[in-house]
Protein backbone atom coordinates (compact mmCIF):
# COMPACT_ATOMS: atom_id res chain seq x y z
CA UNK A 1 0.00 0.00 0.00
CA UNK A 2 1.28 3.48 -0.78
CA UNK A 3 1.07 6.47 1.55
CA UNK A 4 -1.68 8.18 -0.46
CA UNK A 5 -3.96 5.16 -0.20
CA UNK A 6 -3.14 4.72 3.47
CA UNK A 7 -3.97 8.36 4.21
CA UNK A 8 -7.35 8.08 2.48
CA UNK A 9 -8.23 4.82 4.24
CA UNK A 10 -7.01 6.06 7.63
CA UNK A 11 -9.21 9.13 7.27
CA UNK A 12 -12.23 6.94 6.60
CA UNK A 13 -11.82 5.50 10.11
CA UNK A 14 -11.25 8.84 11.87
CA UNK A 15 -13.83 9.73 14.52
CA UNK A 16 -12.97 12.54 16.89
CA UNK A 17 -14.34 15.97 17.87
CA UNK A 18 -14.22 18.68 15.21
CA UNK A 19 -12.91 16.32 12.55
CA UNK A 20 -11.47 18.44 9.77
CA UNK A 21 -10.52 21.37 11.98
CA UNK A 22 -8.83 19.77 14.99
CA UNK A 23 -5.07 19.28 14.79
CA UNK A 24 -4.77 19.02 18.58
CA UNK A 25 -6.55 15.66 18.90
CA UNK A 26 -4.31 13.71 16.50
CA UNK A 27 -1.23 15.43 17.95
CA UNK A 28 -2.12 14.25 21.46
CA UNK A 29 -2.95 10.81 20.10
CA UNK A 30 0.42 10.66 18.35
CA UNK A 31 2.29 11.51 21.53
CA UNK A 32 0.28 8.93 23.49
CA UNK A 33 0.91 6.16 20.98
CA UNK A 34 4.61 7.01 20.71
CA UNK A 35 4.70 6.68 24.48
CA UNK A 36 3.15 3.24 24.20
CA UNK A 37 5.90 2.21 21.76
CA UNK A 38 8.51 3.44 24.24
CA UNK A 39 6.75 1.62 27.09
CA UNK A 40 6.82 -1.69 25.20
CA UNK A 41 10.53 -1.26 24.42
CA UNK A 42 11.20 -0.40 28.07
CA UNK A 43 9.46 -3.58 29.19
CA UNK A 44 11.58 -5.67 26.81
CA UNK A 45 14.67 -4.16 28.40
CA UNK A 46 13.34 -4.65 31.93
CA UNK A 47 11.62 -8.02 31.62
CA UNK A 48 13.39 -9.78 28.75
CA UNK A 49 16.98 -8.60 29.10
CA UNK A 50 16.60 -6.52 25.94
CA UNK A 51 15.72 -9.52 23.77
CA UNK A 52 12.93 -8.74 21.33
CA UNK A 53 10.98 -11.95 20.85
CA UNK A 54 8.14 -12.34 18.33
CA UNK A 55 5.49 -11.41 20.89
CA UNK A 56 7.33 -8.20 21.78
CA UNK A 57 7.88 -7.30 18.14
CA UNK A 58 4.22 -7.86 17.27
CA UNK A 59 3.11 -5.65 20.15
CA UNK A 60 5.45 -2.89 19.02
CA UNK A 61 4.29 -3.31 15.42
CA UNK A 62 0.67 -2.74 16.50
CA UNK A 63 1.62 0.42 18.36
CA UNK A 64 3.65 1.67 15.39
CA UNK A 65 0.52 1.23 13.29
CA UNK A 66 -1.33 3.48 15.73
CA UNK A 67 1.50 6.03 15.49
CA UNK A 68 1.18 5.96 11.70
CA UNK A 69 -2.60 6.43 11.91
CA UNK A 70 -2.22 9.55 14.04
CA UNK A 71 0.57 10.92 11.82
CA UNK A 72 -1.63 10.39 8.80
CA UNK A 73 -4.62 12.12 10.36
CA UNK A 74 -2.51 15.01 11.61
CA UNK A 75 -1.21 15.42 8.06
CA UNK A 76 -4.79 15.49 6.80
CA UNK A 77 -5.81 18.08 9.39
CA UNK A 78 -2.90 20.28 8.27
CA UNK A 79 -3.62 19.68 4.56
CA UNK A 80 -0.35 17.80 4.09
CA UNK A 81 0.05 14.82 1.83
CA UNK A 82 1.61 12.00 3.89
CA UNK A 83 3.71 10.90 0.93
CA UNK A 84 5.07 14.44 0.50
CA UNK A 85 6.00 14.54 4.20
CA UNK A 86 7.85 11.23 3.86
CA UNK A 87 9.68 12.33 0.70
CA UNK A 88 10.62 15.70 2.20
CA UNK A 89 12.05 13.90 5.23
CA UNK A 90 14.18 11.62 3.06
CA UNK A 91 15.42 14.58 1.01
CA UNK A 92 16.39 16.40 4.21
CA UNK A 93 18.29 13.36 5.50
CA UNK A 94 20.00 12.83 2.14
CA UNK A 95 21.14 16.46 2.16
CA UNK A 96 22.47 16.12 5.70
CA UNK A 97 24.30 12.92 4.80
CA UNK A 98 25.90 14.63 1.78
CA UNK A 99 27.12 17.42 4.09
CA UNK A 100 28.28 14.93 6.73
CA UNK A 101 25.77 16.36 9.20
CA UNK A 102 23.46 13.45 10.05
CA UNK A 103 24.63 13.70 13.66
CA UNK A 104 24.16 16.84 15.68
CA UNK A 105 21.16 18.96 16.48
CA UNK A 106 19.06 21.64 14.88
CA UNK A 107 16.68 21.56 11.96
CA UNK A 108 18.90 23.51 9.58
CA UNK A 109 22.02 21.31 9.55
Tell what function each PLM region has.
Residues 1-109:
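Flexible "arm" and connector segments at domain edges
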